[in-house]
């Protein structure tokens, strides 16, 4: 199957500036060749609403796209100038503009492709790039820009990639529109995210939908100068800042103390920062010497052919460093301490966490706010009409999954929550476990109550244990103290009371290197005087401790032919250093225990090479345990953005297939199902004005016609609005039944039920999670290693714990 579905008009001849052949469907075709049925059948049918709307534009085309050059002005000013020209010369013919590209419904040029205009004494040069028709790639770009222009006419400003109320606005200047909230040093700017997307009609053809969501941007009124401390630079690196003079956002890569009189190369001349900001933005810098924010902005480039002979072509990136005076850089979002401030988050949560009924009104409110003033006239010129009600979708609620602990069902009250059930570990009789206790920088007596809570819970579970080795040490002696546990006490696991994240990193690094399992508890939780809260933490710690030792607190009945389930994820450092890839492979019939690997690769070739080695080791382990190779591999891949889907489909799935063919040489190949998991989506579903129930699946209407995808809500949400997870199947080879020799693909219903069942097996939470557990374990492992080693090549996982969930 081609990577893209193409529809062309045979009457159109390609020429510069003329009508050209264009793709009618711009997304790549990711649906596997073997799949014909993409809609599941199991479950109870329910009616849902979603944050999409139908809309109509009467303008038919043809359309013209120009490149526009004018003196440096804000996009709002440029748009106003072009509007004045359209009203005076073209009788108000519709157009849209994104700051550089101009789209029109009539010719703005004469016989030459380039036209020079003068509008209100401003010289403007426009150059024709192409003309196009409806349902082309440019058409959808144009409609997205139309909606961006509508928001500009509503009085919003572009911050980053979205449109919000202006960063300099105050409560008294807010016109009717998105919400504005201010408290202490924080501003919350409201806005809308609008995108034209493709859906699927009942007959399988493509439809066009308007995705719409209310969004917020959190701004901190503190600039970098006011919060800068030399010994706390690490707390600022990785955070986002906004520069209010141009409403652009940047990420802090580094901070350096500089002088505003230092010079920077600007074209063919040098200019001081002081003079640059005075001449360009009329800003007088106040502090001569101050911290400068260093932001490394990545620019995409095309790799030279000579560098891509042995790997697929794709974009690479080069770094361009920007230095910005700290007094002009205002922080966005929250610091770690602000994020953990319960009172602050509670107050701001009234704006940030919106309930389902509020979100259902977003489309109606958007229509109301755009139906006045300049935005109304602008929409009228395009003949645009938006349905004020969100679309209705058919969903299905999958059957609840039974949870068993020691062969007893424990989710009898609430299917997706079994915290009231009694957990029992199936520990063989006579097995004894030795635990050591280490207290860092504190007196061990402060944690006696917590230790007794732990002992009481282990005793309740009727597990043999000893916990006699209790030690204390300073922060710089942690490794030595843990080494004594291995050499002298010979413990199976250490319970460590940690004062901060730095000690936590030391402990987990020691675990990976030596294989000593550890359970970390913050000293705040360990010394809590509230008996109930302290006991809750102790009980949860015990559950994690024995899960790390290889015992299952609960399980599910998921009967399949010998199957291995794989989780893949990548951690990207905020500082732009090397990424960390984690892969986990199931090695138990209940899909509860995994063998884990972590790698730091320089490029895609090295990534595939490491992944091949991991697959070989995992499959060999599986064969040794079950005396057979897996007949089916289900791979859940996280960490793939929308722009990487086509690349992943074309190259990564092909690389996986070649690995498996090599490993299974002279054997029947297993069925391979490769699924991309995407959590960071803004699609919402609503049932009767509230959140949908866990187990709700949507695989119609809003899914793309050239994708094999579905949405699954697996968690119950009591505050705010539930977020589904998107699953995109890139590969689904055929399964061969050895008994009957029948060949078939996995039905959508079965894959959806397996995916939902796997969200019940995270042994750190007695309930469902948003993604299948191997995906989450890979995420936990990649994040743990990435944060500990900060871009440095991580050590290999010690063989003693490779088959343990040490990262719980």
From Swiss-Prot:
Pfam assignment, any one: PAZ
Molecular function per GO: RNA binding
Highest taxon in the source lineage: Eukaryota
Name assigned to this protein: Piwi-like protein 1
Keyword Chloroplast in record: no
Family annotation (SUPFAM superfamilies): PAZ domain, Ribonuclease H-like
Family: Belongs to the argonaute family. Piwi subfamily.
Cited PROSITE patterns: PAZ, PIWI
Gene Ontology process terms (BP): regulatory ncRNA-mediated gene silencing
Limits of the Piwi domain: 492-790
Protein's UniProt keywords contain Transport: no
InterPro entries hit by this protein: PAZ_dom, PAZ_dom_sf, Piwi, RNaseH-like_sf, RNaseH_sf
Domain PAZ: residue ranges: 214-333
Keywords: RNA-mediated gene silencing
Region feature Disordered, mapped onto this chain: 300-322
SMART domains according to UniProt: PAZ, Piwi
Tissue: Expressed in dividing adult somatic stem cells (neoblasts).
